[in-house]
Amino acid sequence: MLRLDKLHAFYGKSHVLHGVSLQVAPGEIVALLGRNGSGRSTTAKAVMGLVETQGEATWKGRSLAGLKPYEIAHRGIAYVPENRDIFPRLTVHQNLQLGQKGGARSARWSFEDMYTMFPRLRERQHTEAGVLSGGEQQMLALCRSLMGDPELIIIDEPTEGLAPKIVELVAEYLLALKARGLSVLLIEQKLTIALEISQRCVVMGHGQVVFEGTPDELRADAAVRKEWLEV
């Protein structure tokens, strides 16, 4: 479904990704792991057309090269950045409305689905998004991305700064998305959560892929964890 082959990325003259290759299959959660500065977020931005790239990025067999971010989104890839990127002066419900593809109703997700999945958002649907807690904002960012009816969600650090109970909820909801056939590229620092919910793990370091395997294989590889993941 999503395939990166020897992908390079640049910020101006800075060469930050060096031949990244990875795949995300239909209905799969792939955890993209690594320390800060390893290239994980840049990989997400490269997929979404937000940075200059060389190499191959394809989605469902079609090249993403030269496409604008909104064109990539319209093809079925949603991106939830680390800063969540919600509209703080709009209400929860208005944020969800803006997530709809071209203003059209999602074929897969309804407002009721969102409020059933996250009951707290139903209670806060007329509240400005800027006054929500961090956990509520993360729920809103995820739900807004779903309203565009994506097939793949790239989500960057969804558990950053959240209470343990909310972290568990986010993990449960990502698994629920997988159960409904969505693919997830999960950029995550919390190794325990990543190993618990992913089917494959990709570890990055210095802008390159340094490990790819199953969660069990990563658990068994103490050298990789020590070299590339431990703080």
Regions found by a protein language model. Name each.
Residues M1-V231:
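Glycine-rich phosphate-binding loops of nucleotide-dependent enzymes
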